[in-house]
Every structure is written in C-alpha cells, then in structure tokens.
Amino acid sequence: MENPIIACDVSKGKSHIQGFIGLSNPVGNPFVVRHLKSDLKLIKELAKSLEKQAHKKPKFVFEFTGIYHECIARYVQSLGLDLYAISPLESAKVRKSQIRVTKTDSKDCLNIATVYYTRCIRKFESDNNDIKSLSRRKRDIREEMVRQRGVYHRYLDLVWPCFDEYFDVDSKVCGIIVSTYKHPYVIKRRSVNMVVEILLNNGRFSKNRAFDIAYKIKDYASNCVSGVDEKSDYVNALISSYSKINSLKKEIEEINLELDNLLRKSPVYQLLKTVPGIGANLLIQMSAEIGDYTRFKTAKQFVAYIGLDPSILQSGTNDGEHYSITRKGNGILRSCLYLVINQMLTRKLDNQITRFYFKKKSSGLSHKVAAVASCRKLACCVFGMLKNGTSFETI
C-alpha cells in the first residue's frame, strides 16, 4: 500500500483539501477549509481517518504560495505530520501535460498528489527566519521612503519655491527650518538671532556657521514668493510628509540594529563581506535571501533558485538554442547580483568577474546580456565560497 497523503491547494484565507492512499485511490471528494481553527480541525479528522485505513501517518503535501501557507503549515506541524511543499510550476507542468487542460481548485489537489507520487520532492522547512523578514521589511520601508520623499519635494516646491537653490532639501538644515517655521513668510518676522538660536538648539553647528546659515535663510525669505498662504492645508501636508520621512528613518535605524546583532552570527554574511562591490544594504539583502545554503547540492541548483539558468528549446533539427534566463527564481537575489556587477564595473575593479564581463562584451553582446552572464558566474563563485567556507579571492 502506498503512503497516504493529504493534498492541499492553498489560496488566500481558504484551502482545498483531499486525502489519497496512492494516486489511484483518492479518499472522498475535495473539500474547502477556511484558515480558522474551527475549520482546520477537519484536517485532523482526515489525518486520523487516513491513518486508520493505511496504518501509516499521512504526509501533508501543499503547493507553496507566498505567505498564505504559513498559518496552515504551523497548524499541521502541531499535529505532528510531516510537511512536503511543491512549487506551483511543478503542478502546472502536470496540469499542462494532460490532454484536456482543466484548472480548478478542486482538480489541483489531484495534480499536487500526482507530483508527490511521481517525483522526488523535499521535506518542507519553514522559512520563518528573522533576517529575511527584517531585510524585506527594510526594503519595503526604503521604497515607501522614496515615495514619501517625492511627496515632500512636491509640497516643498509649492510652499518654499527655489529653496533647493539655497540649501540641499534633504539636509538637516532644511529639515530644521521647514519643521520649525513651516512657511517662509514666518521667517520674515523673525530676527537673525532667533534663527541662530533655533539652529544651535537643534543641530551641531558652530556659532559662526549658524549665523552664515541664518543670514542666507533671511535673504531667501525676503526674496521668496510662496505658492500658498500660511494657513493653507498644503503647509500641513508638507510638515506631515516630513514627519513621516523621519519616522521611517528611525524605523530603518531600529531594523539595522536588529540585523547587525543577527548577522554577526551568520557565516553567509561574513563570507559575502569579502566580495568586492557588495555594499552594506546589498550585503544584508543577499545574506537574508540566500538563507540556508546547505539546501543546494550543486551550483546549478543555486543558479536555478536565483532564476539565472537559461531556457532551452530543443526539437527535431533544432539543437537546443539558448534563449533568455528563466526568471523563475528569487527576483530580489537576482537584482542584488545585477547591482553588484554594475558596482564592480563602476569602480573599475579588476577580477575574474569583470574580466569575464569584458570578454562577453567584446564578443558582441550588449551590456545587459553580458552583465546577466556575469551574474551567473558570480552566483557560482558565491556558491563555491559558501560550500567550501572560503573568502572571495581575485584571480
């Protein structure tokens, strides 16, 4: 008798479940469970029923889908069942291999079971690692900060026109003046000494430097023609966007402290530090996205995980022309490697990676194609470093 399994097609808030004792022996019809404790108890009942019939504990097999599987995976682990995750690409291959292609949630349970019984799949290991979650949260915050800065600059150009000709609008001086006075016309009514006092209390300026800035600000205020009056809601919007930027900066600082404590123990982080061209932010992102490198047995598996493996089509007399990369892997890690290559080229570093790039470039390839090929070579180098525990060495 084949191993019993519970096949699960996961979606947002609910999943389709079906039991199997062998591929040709489904137990009952697929049914829907919501991701609530009251519904998830049905999985426990199904597991007991399958164990009674097959005299073996069933395995729980599900389709890996972003974040929606996490709650159901934790519940099933609490039942003491082994979990196996399959890629949506694998179940899609099974579905497309059928003569009559049918895509329904209930039918997907059978496709998932087919993958389990006909292919070798790995046991699921929860990817709940703090480094990755913190790194991705930091990335989201940085993206939000870029958006918020755009909003801030737009309001600043309206309320404080031409201020960027006097000061760097992202500097501390600009922040102190805008948050304190809110509108340039307010400065007209303030003395130079009052402006100096504000600068000395809120920033690290010498007295002479503070007076220079104060005279410059007074000169700006006397020439400024604001697009709105002092009571306009745009002034409030400007201050609000400035406060949001400061709040996001503080959040990033807190995350950086947490990441610093966690990454000190990470061998991946320590080895990647030796690769030239990897800055602080890229270093954190790459360490987080690689995670447990021991799950990759070969460099080819690591390259495929990043999505840098070439797609190949072979048919008849066509000997298998190599097309573009698959892009079916970890997009964040792929982007990081591409940025590292560009950084190496910008800094004019001389190593085996940049020489490989120029070799490809001299053969007629465009910058992008040569850079992507270099990313693949760098990925192989990184895998070798991690597997052997060696630092990057320029050859």
Show where each model-derived region lies.
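A detector of single, family-specific signature residues
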Residues: 1-395
